């Protein structure tokens, strides 16, 4: 879709504007994508390692976090390709397939993150507001089914992004991540944008607002001394998910709406073009940074993180000492279906 925010500009009249944003774009994207790649890879890799090593402590929350970490890792593995593209000043070196895959991976991760966070918020709301129904609704099996449905839905509905192929510019350089070049493609992208805006952002955002409002009212009415750990996990989830929506998802979707309509304007003043292009660079980088928010969701709202690390250390020590007939005691299952 609108990756770099460079509208089609006549080479003779507006070349100065195009060149100035190229320098800004290449520096910002290459720097921020590099940082997001490193932080996202190690953060999500560590979360996935802890969750897999302690998989015997199954919970619905763990199922969602595993899927969220996998989606993030798949995305950050393609970010180095973007870094190389902008380091080489907007010249694509990796063929048409990887160009399509890189664009596709970013949007699959973006909307998988939104839907996984929404599902986690909904089931945490059910666990707190409707504790009786929680027993039958918030289960590992249902969490797995929800995750499968989310993956299938996002993979299929994001398939139009696979159409974002490479092309040659007037200097015969191979380009990738560029906006549509003709009006027919722009109209198609605008329709695709509004579908993804309502289904992939507005509806999930309204859902989490309703869920968090119900959670807050329930916590305020209940005794402060009861379920202190559950209260902390709920507050942690509210803070992290709300921050992800406000910092990563909302600015990007608002700016993308404005930008796509801007591309349809016949007259574009130079200063407006520069401001629009720079805003695309900032908001798209913020959207990609959701890979760094997701590990925080586990650290601050997953609960029992230290206990899981302690379990891993016990397994490591027991495997090194070779003491027979001494087994590491495992946490009991099923005491709290929404303990994570």
Swiss-Prot record:
Extracellular compartment residues: 1-31, 82-109, 166-196, 255-279
GO biological process, one term: calcium ion transport
GO MF terms, alphabetically ordered: leukotriene receptor activity
Gene of this entry: CYSLTR1
Domain of life per record: Eukaryota
Name of the molecule in the record: Cysteinyl leukotriene receptor 1
Gene3D superfamilies in the record: Rhodopsin 7-helix transmembrane proteins (1.20.1070.10)
A GO CC annotation given for this chain: plasma membrane
Keywords tagged on the record: Cell membrane, Disulfide bond, G-protein coupled receptor, Glycoprotein, Membrane, Receptor, Transducer, Transmembrane, Transmembrane helix
Glycosylated sites: 14, 172, 265
Membrane topology (Cytoplasmic): 53-60, 131-144, 218-233, 301-340
Segments traversing the membrane: 32-52, 61-81, 110-130, 145-165, 197-217, 234-254, 280-300
Organism: Cavia porcellus
UniProt similarity note: Belongs to the G-protein coupled receptor 1 family.
Topology term for the membrane: Multi-pass membrane protein
Location, primary (coarse class): membrane
Lineage of origin: Eukaryota, Metazoa, Chordata, Craniata, Vertebrata
């Amino acid at each position: 879709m609108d990756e770099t925010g460079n509208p089609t500009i006549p080479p003779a009249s507006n070349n100065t504007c195009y060149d100035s944003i190229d320098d800004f774009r290449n520096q910002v994207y290459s720097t921020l994508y590099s940082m997001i790649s490193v932080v996202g890879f190690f953060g999500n890799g560590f979360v996935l390692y802890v969750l897999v090593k302690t998989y015997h402590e199954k919970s619905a929350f763990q199922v969602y976090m595993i899927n969220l970490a996998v989606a993030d890792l798949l995305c950050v593995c393609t970010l180095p390709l973007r870094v190389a593209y902008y380091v080489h000043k907007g010249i694509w070196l990796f063929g048409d397939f990887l160009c399509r895959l890189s664009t596709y991976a970013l949007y699959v991760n973006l909307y998988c993150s939104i839907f996984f966070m929404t599902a986690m918020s909904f089931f945490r709301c059910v666990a707190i507001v409707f504790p009786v129904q929680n027993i039958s609704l918030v289960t590992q099996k249902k969490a797995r089914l929800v995750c499968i449905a989310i993956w299938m839905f996002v993979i299929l509905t994001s398939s139009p992004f696979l159409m974002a192929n490479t092309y040659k510019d007037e200097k015969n350089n191979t380009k990738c991540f560029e906006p549509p070049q003709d009006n027919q493609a722009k109209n198609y992208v605008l329709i695709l944008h509004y579908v993804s805006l309502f289904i992939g952002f507005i509806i999930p955002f309204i859902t989490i607002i309703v869920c968090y409002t119900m959670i807050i009212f329930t916590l305020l009415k209940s005794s402060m001394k009861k379920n202190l750990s559950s209260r902390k996990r709920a507050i942690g989830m509210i803070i992290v998910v709300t921050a992800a929506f406000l910092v990563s998802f909302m600015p990007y979707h608002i700016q993308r709406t404005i930008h796509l309509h801007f591309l349809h304007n016949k007259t574009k003043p130079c200063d407006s073009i520069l401001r629009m292009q720079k805003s695309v660079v900032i908001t798209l980088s913020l959207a990609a940074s959701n890979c760094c928010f997701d590990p925080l969701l586990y650290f601050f709202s997953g609960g029992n993180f230290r206990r899981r690390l302690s379990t891993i250390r016990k397994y490591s020590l027991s495997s090194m000492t070779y003491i027979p007939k001494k087994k590491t005691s495992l946490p009991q299952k099923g005491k709290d279906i929404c303990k994570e």
